[in-house]
Amino acid sequence: MPPYTIVYFPVRGRCEATRMLLADQGQSWKEEVVTIDVWLQGSLKSTCLYGQLPKFEDGDLTLYQSNAILRHLGRSLGLYGKDQKEAALVDMVNDGVEDLRCKYGTLIYTNYENGKDDYVKALPGHLKPFETLLSQNQGGKAFIVGNQISFADYNLLDLLLVHQVLAPGCLDNFPLLSAYVARLSARPKIKAFLSSPDHLNRPINGNGKQ
Protein backbone atom coordinates (compact mmCIF):
# COMPACT_ATOMS: atom_id res chain seq x y z
CA MET A 1 0.00 0.00 0.00
CA PRO A 2 1.52 3.35 -0.99
CA PRO A 3 2.27 5.53 2.04
CA TYR A 4 0.69 8.61 0.49
CA THR A 5 -2.77 9.33 -0.90
CA ILE A 6 -3.72 12.35 -3.00
CA VAL A 7 -7.41 13.20 -3.16
CA TYR A 8 -7.97 15.71 -5.94
CA PHE A 9 -9.76 16.55 -9.15
CA PRO A 10 -8.60 14.98 -12.44
CA VAL A 11 -6.38 17.98 -13.23
CA ARG A 12 -2.82 19.10 -12.60
CA GLY A 13 -3.84 22.25 -10.78
CA ARG A 14 -2.43 22.61 -7.30
CA CYS A 15 -1.24 19.01 -7.05
CA GLU A 16 1.18 18.57 -9.92
CA ALA A 17 4.12 19.99 -7.98
CA THR A 18 3.44 17.47 -5.21
CA ARG A 19 3.17 14.63 -7.72
CA MET A 20 6.40 15.74 -9.39
CA LEU A 21 8.18 15.89 -6.04
CA LEU A 22 7.03 12.40 -5.08
CA ALA A 23 7.98 10.98 -8.47
CA ASP A 24 11.45 12.56 -8.41
CA GLN A 25 12.03 11.29 -4.89
CA GLY A 26 11.09 7.74 -5.86
CA GLN A 27 7.97 7.72 -3.70
CA SER A 28 4.77 5.89 -4.55
CA TRP A 29 1.31 7.26 -3.92
CA LYS A 30 -2.34 6.48 -4.48
CA GLU A 31 -4.68 8.80 -6.38
CA GLU A 32 -8.31 9.17 -5.37
CA VAL A 33 -9.82 11.13 -8.25
CA VAL A 34 -12.83 13.30 -7.46
CA THR A 35 -15.02 14.23 -10.42
CA ILE A 36 -16.73 17.59 -10.47
CA ASP A 37 -20.11 15.87 -10.31
CA VAL A 38 -19.17 14.10 -7.10
CA TRP A 39 -17.74 17.31 -5.67
CA LEU A 40 -20.88 19.29 -6.45
CA GLN A 41 -22.98 16.78 -4.54
CA GLY A 42 -21.41 18.33 -1.47
CA SER A 43 -20.95 15.34 0.82
CA LEU A 44 -17.17 15.14 0.33
CA LYS A 45 -16.78 18.91 0.44
CA SER A 46 -18.53 19.03 3.79
CA THR A 47 -15.88 16.73 5.27
CA CYS A 48 -12.92 18.77 3.99
CA LEU A 49 -11.43 21.10 6.57
CA TYR A 50 -11.52 24.20 4.37
CA GLY A 51 -14.16 22.92 1.99
CA GLN A 52 -11.59 22.44 -0.75
CA LEU A 53 -9.09 20.02 -2.27
CA PRO A 54 -6.37 18.77 -2.43
CA LYS A 55 -6.51 16.45 0.52
CA PHE A 56 -3.32 14.56 1.33
CA GLU A 57 -2.90 11.54 3.55
CA ASP A 58 0.41 10.39 4.99
CA GLY A 59 -0.43 7.44 7.19
CA ASP A 60 -2.68 8.77 9.95
CA LEU A 61 -1.86 12.40 9.08
CA THR A 62 -4.39 14.23 6.91
CA LEU A 63 -3.42 17.57 5.41
CA TYR A 64 -5.17 20.22 3.37
CA GLN A 65 -3.64 23.26 1.63
CA SER A 66 -1.20 22.53 -1.19
CA ASN A 67 1.69 24.51 0.28
CA ALA A 68 1.34 22.85 3.68
CA ILE A 69 1.57 19.51 1.86
CA LEU A 70 4.74 20.62 0.07
CA ARG A 71 6.32 21.87 3.29
CA HIS A 72 5.47 18.62 5.08
CA LEU A 73 7.13 16.60 2.33
CA GLY A 74 10.04 19.03 2.35
CA ARG A 75 10.64 18.35 6.03
CA SER A 76 10.08 14.60 5.89
CA LEU A 77 12.12 13.97 2.73
CA GLY A 78 14.98 16.40 3.34
CA LEU A 79 13.91 18.96 0.75
CA TYR A 80 13.98 22.08 2.93
CA GLY A 81 17.54 23.39 2.59
CA LYS A 82 20.59 22.35 4.58
CA ASP A 83 20.11 24.80 7.46
CA GLN A 84 17.77 27.43 8.88
CA LYS A 85 19.04 30.14 6.54
CA GLU A 86 18.34 28.04 3.46
CA ALA A 87 14.98 26.94 4.88
CA ALA A 88 14.00 30.61 5.25
CA LEU A 89 14.99 31.27 1.64
CA VAL A 90 13.06 28.20 0.46
CA ASP A 91 9.98 29.55 2.25
CA MET A 92 10.49 32.96 0.64
CA VAL A 93 10.73 31.44 -2.84
CA ASN A 94 7.68 29.29 -2.29
CA ASP A 95 5.66 32.29 -1.12
CA GLY A 96 6.70 34.08 -4.30
CA VAL A 97 5.54 31.10 -6.33
CA GLU A 98 2.21 31.18 -4.51
CA ASP A 99 1.77 34.88 -5.28
CA LEU A 100 2.17 34.24 -9.01
CA ARG A 101 0.08 31.07 -8.90
CA CYS A 102 -2.79 33.05 -7.37
CA LYS A 103 -2.53 35.65 -10.14
CA TYR A 104 -2.53 32.83 -12.70
CA GLY A 105 -5.57 31.19 -11.10
CA THR A 106 -7.49 34.46 -11.12
CA LEU A 107 -6.75 34.87 -14.82
CA ILE A 108 -7.72 31.30 -15.72
CA TYR A 109 -10.94 31.15 -13.74
CA THR A 110 -12.28 34.70 -13.79
CA ASN A 111 -10.79 36.85 -16.54
CA TYR A 112 -9.11 34.72 -19.22
CA GLU A 113 -10.56 36.26 -22.37
CA ASN A 114 -10.34 39.88 -21.28
CA GLY A 115 -7.26 39.68 -19.11
CA LYS A 116 -4.79 37.42 -20.89
CA ASP A 117 -3.04 40.12 -22.92
CA ASP A 118 -2.45 42.34 -19.91
CA TYR A 119 -1.36 39.35 -17.84
CA VAL A 120 1.23 38.31 -20.42
CA LYS A 121 2.52 41.89 -20.67
CA ALA A 122 2.99 42.02 -16.90
CA LEU A 123 4.50 38.54 -16.68
CA PRO A 124 8.18 39.54 -17.11
CA GLY A 125 7.94 41.64 -13.97
CA HIS A 126 6.67 38.63 -12.05
CA LEU A 127 9.35 36.31 -13.43
CA LYS A 128 12.29 38.65 -12.85
CA PRO A 129 12.62 37.93 -9.10
CA PHE A 130 13.17 34.24 -9.81
CA GLU A 131 15.82 35.05 -12.41
CA THR A 132 17.49 37.28 -9.82
CA LEU A 133 17.41 34.53 -7.19
CA LEU A 134 19.02 32.08 -9.60
CA SER A 135 21.75 34.60 -10.47
CA GLN A 136 22.57 34.92 -6.77
CA ASN A 137 22.99 31.17 -6.30
CA GLN A 138 26.07 29.71 -7.99
CA GLY A 139 25.51 31.80 -11.09
CA GLY A 140 22.18 30.16 -11.78
CA LYS A 141 23.71 26.76 -12.44
CA ALA A 142 22.17 25.00 -9.43
CA PHE A 143 18.79 25.10 -7.74
CA ILE A 144 16.73 28.06 -6.62
CA VAL A 145 18.31 27.82 -3.14
CA GLY A 146 21.57 26.13 -2.20
CA ASN A 147 23.05 23.08 -3.90
CA GLN A 148 20.27 20.58 -3.29
CA ILE A 149 16.74 20.43 -4.61
CA SER A 150 13.93 21.71 -2.39
CA PHE A 151 10.17 21.54 -2.48
CA ALA A 152 10.19 25.11 -3.80
CA ASP A 153 12.04 23.92 -6.91
CA TYR A 154 9.23 21.54 -7.79
CA ASN A 155 6.61 24.21 -7.19
CA LEU A 156 8.51 26.78 -9.26
CA LEU A 157 9.18 24.30 -12.07
CA ASP A 158 5.51 23.40 -12.32
CA LEU A 159 4.51 27.07 -12.37
CA LEU A 160 7.04 27.88 -15.10
CA LEU A 161 5.89 24.94 -17.21
CA VAL A 162 2.25 26.03 -17.12
CA HIS A 163 3.28 29.58 -18.02
CA GLN A 164 5.18 28.27 -21.02
CA VAL A 165 1.86 26.82 -22.17
CA LEU A 166 0.01 30.07 -21.49
CA ALA A 167 2.67 32.27 -23.09
CA PRO A 168 5.20 30.36 -25.21
CA GLY A 169 8.47 32.24 -25.23
CA CYS A 170 7.82 33.86 -21.85
CA LEU A 171 11.26 32.71 -20.68
CA ASP A 172 13.14 33.82 -23.78
CA ASN A 173 14.52 36.89 -22.02
CA PHE A 174 15.35 34.93 -18.86
CA PRO A 175 18.31 32.71 -19.75
CA LEU A 176 18.83 31.40 -16.24
CA LEU A 177 15.17 30.42 -15.84
CA SER A 178 15.17 28.82 -19.28
CA ALA A 179 18.24 26.76 -18.40
CA TYR A 180 16.75 25.94 -15.00
CA VAL A 181 13.57 24.54 -16.55
CA ALA A 182 15.59 22.49 -19.03
CA ARG A 183 17.95 21.22 -16.36
CA LEU A 184 15.28 20.16 -13.88
CA SER A 185 13.04 18.71 -16.59
CA ALA A 186 15.96 16.52 -17.67
CA ARG A 187 16.32 14.86 -14.26
CA PRO A 188 15.55 11.23 -15.12
CA LYS A 189 12.58 10.77 -12.81
CA ILE A 190 11.10 14.19 -13.61
CA LYS A 191 11.58 13.53 -17.32
CA ALA A 192 9.75 10.21 -16.96
CA PHE A 193 6.98 11.88 -14.97
CA LEU A 194 6.51 14.71 -17.48
CA SER A 195 6.27 12.22 -20.35
CA SER A 196 3.94 9.82 -18.52
CA PRO A 197 0.34 9.34 -19.70
CA ASP A 198 -0.91 10.26 -16.23
CA HIS A 199 0.68 13.70 -16.51
CA LEU A 200 -0.01 14.28 -20.19
CA ASN A 201 -3.66 13.25 -19.96
CA ARG A 202 -4.43 15.50 -17.00
CA PRO A 203 -5.69 18.95 -18.01
CA ILE A 204 -3.77 21.81 -16.45
CA ASN A 205 -6.92 23.46 -15.13
CA GLY A 206 -10.47 22.46 -14.39
CA ASN A 207 -12.16 24.69 -16.96
CA GLY A 208 -10.07 23.69 -19.97
CA LYS A 209 -8.33 27.05 -20.22
CA GLN A 210 -4.57 27.20 -20.23
From Swiss-Prot:
Domain GST N-terminal as annotated: residue spans: 2-81
Catalytic activity entry: RX + glutathione = an S-substituted glutathione + a halide anion + H(+); prostaglandin J2 + glutathione = prostaglandin J2-S-(R)-glutathione; prostaglandin J2 + glutathione = prostaglandin J2-S-(S)-glutathione; prostaglandin A2 + glutathione = prostaglandin A2-S-(S)-glutathione
EC number: 2.5.1.18
Family membership: Belongs to the GST superfamily. Pi family.
Protein's job: Conjugation of reduced glutathione to a wide number of exogenous and endogenous hydrophobic electrophiles. Involved in the formation of glutathione conjugates of both prostaglandin A2 (PGA2) and prostaglandin J2 (PGJ2). Participates in the formation of novel hepoxilin regioisomers. Negatively regulates CDK5 activity via p25/p35 translocation to prevent neurodegeneration.
Quaternary structure, from the entry: Homodimer. Interacts with CDK5.
Protein name listed in UniProt: Glutathione S-transferase P
The species this protein was found in: Rattus norvegicus
